[in-house]
Amino acid sequence: MKAINNKHHFMVDLETLSSESNAHILETALVCFDPVSGEVSEHGTFHVRHGLDKQDGAIISVETLEWWYKTNRNYLAKLLNPKDEDKEILAFTLHRMQALFDDARGDGGLLVWNTGTFDVELLNNAFKRIINPNMTLINFWEVRDCRSLRTIGDMFPRLQQTVPEATHNAYEDCIRQIGYITDVTQYLAKQD
């Protein structure tokens, strides 16, 4: 477990206006955390909204808009019209992530957790479209999937719990997913 503890762990979650890899990104949360204790570090953690600012090459899906409208139209309104203090241009967010990830790579390594590959694929696509078409923000070997740990958790009755529903607030969803990871890693650490 020592090798994985030396790495910098980040949970990422996005809220978007499409399920395609070139979706318009409405909200980004990045949370730096300890996978065993679940402790969240303020350094490397942020939660920003992008609203409908121009994102070169991004698409918006009517089906996704309908889904948002049916699922949580009040939160969609907040995402579409963010307060000034919550708003950040996506290009700035991508540069900020790049700096954090490069620092982590130079200091023990980087692991980026998400559900499936959706969030990482969208971030890499946006990075190539907006920042540099010849660079990748997150390398495939740095990606970890929360679903794998949830599957392991389901194998052990002591770890089976009621899974909180996704709120579709990117930061809250990051914290929920960190809970899955922490439950499993703490259980496995006790088995040593």
Question: Model-derived features: where do they sit?
Answer:
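Conserved non-catalytic scaffold segment of RNase H-like nuclease domains
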Residues: 2, 6-10, 15-113
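Acidic active-site catalytic centers that drive phospho-/nucleotidyl reactions
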Residues: 13-15, 119, 145, 173
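Feature marks short, surface-exposed loop/turn motifs that line or immediately flank catalytic pockets
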Residues: 18, 119, 150
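Residue-level signal for well-ordered alpha-helical scaffold segments within enzymatic catalytic domains
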Residues: 78, 96-99, 103, 121, ...
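Substrate-recognition/cap helix-loop segment adjacent to the acidic, metal-dependent catalytic center
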Residues: 101, 117-140
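Acidic, Mg2+-coordinating catalytic module of metal-dependent nucleases/exonucleases
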Residues: 110-117, 121-122, 157-192
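Short, flexible loop segments at boundaries between secondary-structure elements
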Residues: 137-157
